[in-house]
Amino acid sequence: METSQKHYFDDADEALSPETSRPNFVKLAPVFSMTPETSLHPLSDDGHDTLRGLEEWFSEHGGTAVATDYLEALLTGWAPKIPARAWGLDAPKLIAWHSKSEMNEVFLASEARTRLATALGELKITGSISPAGLAEGRKGLNALRPVPQIPRGTRHWPYRDEVPSALADIGNVLDSAPIG
């Protein structure tokens, strides 16, 4: 439901819907925006929880809400912490880091999806993504791009072969989103 001219929120008892999303989001994210049935969807699982929390954050803080403040508050309580250096690694180093432990991949992927969901949730709620939100979304996207290159022996993810095209779709949304 629309609670102000600026913010669109979903009904907590309903699924993601075009009627409760900013038109910019619906226009830019038609490929994945309303069908969060797989773990590739940026608003499923971690992303759904992030979106619901972000909606609460915007509802509580109104016009002063900042999506990245929500993300920072959310990640403060997470353990284990992903080393800050991991977010800036190039693909070969990120693959090596992922491959050291299945848990590295699990935790980094979860946090990456949360960063993406924050950026896309901001677009869904407000109709634009802040520069800081876009930077966080790109961090998440860049951390997920090497996933298909991780040796299959470390972790078999059933959607691994679909990751490149799904991430390309998400990247296109980030590239096309209004910055605000």
Where are these regions (language model features)?
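Ligand-binding pocket scaffold of soluble enzyme catalytic domains
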Residues: H61, E136-G140, R152-R155
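Amphipathic alpha-helical segments within extended alpha-helical solenoids and repeat-rich scaffolds
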Residues: L74-K81, R138-P148
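Acidic, Ser/Thr- and Gly/Pro-rich intrinsically disordered linkers and low-complexity segments
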Residues: L75-E105
